[in-house]
Swiss-Prot record:
SMART domains: KISc
GO CC terms: axon cytoplasm; centriole; centrosome; ciliary tip; cilium; cytoplasm; cytosol; extracellular exosome
Chain positions with Phosphoserine modification: 687
Organism from which the protein derives: Homo sapiens
Binding site for ATP: 100-107
Organism phylogeny: Eukaryota, Metazoa, Chordata, Craniata, Vertebrata
Gene name tied to this protein: KIF3A
Protein name: Kinesin-like protein KIF3A
Length: 699
């Protein structure tokens, strides 16, 4: 029995936020930029210095985990992504996404260099982790793993694994499923190598471009989704299905046109990217602000798809990527502020038990039906087995007209062993037929034809049996049995992850011990400072405290000034977007006013409505108007006239001067294109023109 949502255990967790700082790249070194970011991995703090202002105090941010420029890919995975993927394998939804300015290493964190095991990112490492877990599961547990890959390019959702990557897909929502993409292709995978091949295929179709800040800049947001269904026996003895979805999101970076040098198509892409990231920031702000009653999920495709990941049914980890150069000071501060705000988002994740859109139970049911068919044998008609059986399968039935009719019984079941026996019997009868020389030629041909017919039917049954076996094998390949070694090449990667995880645990214990010792020393120092032996020492102590408070005051003032500047920049950006939209709106209104009459404009406005699902205006009942109806209506053939149609053009419907004039005008011969009358024939002569006749009649 499916469990109601209210009965499912919920875990209320905050969004986990980690920060990763990349090292200075070659371009920044050649331009002699200074390092403005300091990372303290033990304390979990990021400190940003403003190098061109010595009076301004540094800004410090604290997060769950921070990674410096020397951090390893395996450490990043084990500390951040491993807990999320373990939760997905238990049946929770999970989301991992990288956020930050363009060129800060988001794609490297998520994907890395797949050819080198030590440099693989979160997505490839998750493949080995998932199938490593399946290989260690119990033998009666069944798994089904499927993947999909999409991108959001210029606010259009595209399928990176479909035949046509430029086709625009629609975002839909259902109460039982939630937000989903209509017609998005998904592929069932059996091992980590299959996943890697599919990801490589989708990555080739992704939109990338070069800017001044990044040669391989992602021009779209990409979401790689892994759906893991698990079927195992519950306490009640019944089989229960759990389904976890893992969304691995690689966001395009926010960018400034002055720094990236984007023009033309790149500028249009940057505008759309910045708008969607701005909406993401607004969603984060609305979720954190307790007073906000509306969360603008629908303002962009990205936030609509991440609706469950931010404040919904999901365990979410956000990796904020920053650059260390003082050149990107403003962008780094902005990213850290958004990340600091996202820490306060609360999600309510629950295990998805017996979901309606699970495929594992459907596959298992089909496998059982196919096995049952194969055990019982194929269905072939009684006449296909043998001549003697054909006589037994027919029995007389007398109808109302007294004539005898034959009724065929049900179909016979033929097992594989029975097929072998039948084949041997057919061979024996063929040999016996060849040895009988005293038979008539007609009887021999008849017997041979009967044997060929039976052999053909037997061959057909064997082919159907083989087809069922192949279908069963294909379905069983899709369903993965727990405890089977599926790692292949990924086994080495899983081993590497395990070793790195053990090493991290030891380092974490040592770091925790050092942190406790450091706190104790700090407390001892404070206690010593509190004990003054003279007024002079007390004055020195008070002066130190005063300096600390003064530093904090200056930091608060600097923070306020930075916030005002950032707010001003956001306002300017929004105003620029408004000006651009206003120009486009004026152009559209000019076209409409010059080509569509005012009455029709009002009619269109009355019958138009906004469709939230596809983000477009739609006209009501447009299917029953214009060309749509003209396509369905058959065009009458002008050459063929209706035999029942009567020409009533010459009949007076009213005896008025105008009707008389019109009826006589029709008698005039048609004129040629030059305006001259056609030559008169000998049969038909008119003494006067119609105008003369009309005038005479009226007089």
């Amino acid at each position: 029995m499916p469990i109601n949502k209210s009965e499912k255990p919920e875990s209320c967790d905050n969004v986990k936020v980690v920060v990763r700082c990349r090292p200075l790249n070659e371009r920044e070194k050649s331009m002699c930029y200074k390092q403005a970011v300091s990372v303290d991995e033990m304390r979990g703090t990021i400190t940003v210095h403003k190098t061109d202002s010595s009076n301004e105090p540094p800004k410090t941010f604290t997060f769950d985990t921070v990674f410096g420029p020397e951090s390893k890919q395996l450490d990043v995975y084990n500390l951040t992504a491993r807990p999320i993927i373990d939760s997905v394998l238990e049946g929770y939804n999970g989301t991992i996404f990288a956020y930050g300015q363009t060129g800060t290493g988001k794609t490297f964190t998520m994907e890395g260099v797949r050819a080198i095991p030590e440099l693989r990112g979160i997505i490839p490492n998750s493949f080995a982790h998932i199938f490593g877990h399946i290989a260690k599961a119990e033998g009666d547990t069944r798994f089904l793993v499927r993947v999909s890959y999409l991108e959001i390019y210029n606010e259009e959702v595209r399928d990176l694994l479909g035949k046509d990557q430029t086709q625009r897909l629609e975002v839909k929502e259902r109460p039982d499923v939630g937000v989903y993409i209509k017609d998005l292709s998904a592929y069932v995978v059996n091992n980590a190598d299959d996943m890697d091949r599919i990801m490589t295929l989708g990555h080739k179709n992704r939109s990338v471009g070069a800017t001044n800040m990044n040669e391989h800049s992602s021009r779209s947001h990409a979401i790689f989704t892994i759906t893991i269904e698990c079927s195992e026996k519950g306490i009640d003895g019944n089989m229960h299905v759990r389904m976890g979805k893992l969304h691995l999101v690689d966001l395009a970076g926010s960018e400034r046109q002055a720094k990236t040098g984007a023009t033309g198509q790149r500028l249009k892409e940057a505008t759309k990217i910045n708008l969607s990231l701005s909406t993401l920031g607004n969603v984060i702000s609305a979720l954190v602000d307790g007073k906000s009653t509306h969360v603008p999920y629908r303002n962009s495709k990205l936030t609509r798809l991440l609706q469950d990941s931010l404040g919904g049914n999901s365990k979410t980890m956000m990796c904020a990527n920053i650059g260390p150069a003082d050149y990107n000071y403003d962008e780094t501060i902005s990213t850290l502020r958004y990340a600091n705000r996202a820490k306060n988002i609360k999600n309510k994740a629950r295990i998805n038990e017996d979901p309606k859109d699970a495929l594992l139970r459907q596959f298992q049911k089909e496998i059982e039906e196919l096995k049952k068919k194969l055990e019982e044998g194929e269905e072939i008609s009684g006449s296909d087995i043998s001549g003697s059986e054909e006589d037994d399968d027919e029995e007389g039935e007398v109808g109302e007209d007294g004539e005898k009719r034959k009724k065929r019984r049900g179909k016979k079941k033929v097992s594989p062993d029975k097929m072998i026996e039948m084949q041997a019997k057919i061979d024996e009868e063929r040999k016996a037929l060849e040895t009988k020389l005293d038979m008539e030629e007609e009887e021999r041909n008849k017997a041979r034809a009967e044997l060929e017919k039976r052999e053909k039917d037997l061959l057909k049954a064997q082919q159907e049996h083989q087809s069922l076996l192949e279908k069963l094998s294909a379905l069983e390949k899709k369903v993965i049995v727990g405890g089977v070694d599926l790692l292949a090449k990924a086994e080495e990667q899983e081993k590497l992850l395990e070793e790195s995880n053990m090493e991290l645990e030891e380092r974490r214990k040592r770091a925790e011990q050092l942190r406790r010792e450091l706190e104790e020393k700090e407390q001892e120092r404070l206690d010593i400072e509190e004990k003054y032996t003279s007024l002079q020492e007390e004055a020195q102590g008070k002066t130190k405290k005063l300096k600390k408070v003064w530093t904090m005051l200056m930091a608060a003032k600097s923070e306020m000034a930075d916030l005002q500047q950032e707010h001003q920049r956001e306002i300017e950006g929004l105003l620029e977007n408004i000006r651009q939209l206003s120009r486009e709106l004026r152009l559209q209104m000019l076209i409409i006013d010059n080509f569509i009459p005012r009455d029709y404009q009002e009619m269109i406005e009355n019958y138009v409505h906004w469709n939230e699902d596809i983000g477009e205006w739609q006209l009501k009942c447009v299917a029953y108007t214009g060309n749509n109806m003209r396509k369905q209506t058959p065009v009458p053939d002008k050459k063929e006239k209706d035999p029942f149609e009567v020409d009533l053009s010459h009949v007076y419907l009213a005896y008025t001067e105008e009707s008389l004039r019109q009826s006589l005008m029709k008698l005039e011969r048609p004129r040629t294109s030059k305006g001259k009358a056609r030559p008169k024939t000998g049969r038909r002569k008119r003494s006067a023109k119609p105008e003369t006749v009309i005038d005479s009649l009226l007089q």
